[in-house]
Amino acid sequence: MPAAEGEKLSERAKLQKRLSRIRGQVEAMRRALDTDASCAKLLQQATACRGALDGFIAEVIEDHIRDRVVRASDHAAATAAAEELIEIVHSYLT
């Protein structure tokens, strides 16, 4: 198996773990809401969940830069990948 494929599988596993943690955090928020937890507790859990999701997004953006922009076969492909990334980041930030 080429190194790039092995790296992709490793990255996929890392992203799956991140998503599992996010799912657990969302479920914890749901349970807290069902048990009438305080607003402070809910906000604490929500910000932790948002931080985990931000980390997931950062990983995916990093992978996109490495796989599509840096490894582009030519300037046109790199430009297209960069434009796609700009749109994604813009929609994320606004």
Please describe what each predicted stretch is.
Residues 1-94:
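Solvent-exposed interaction patches of small proteins and small membrane subunits
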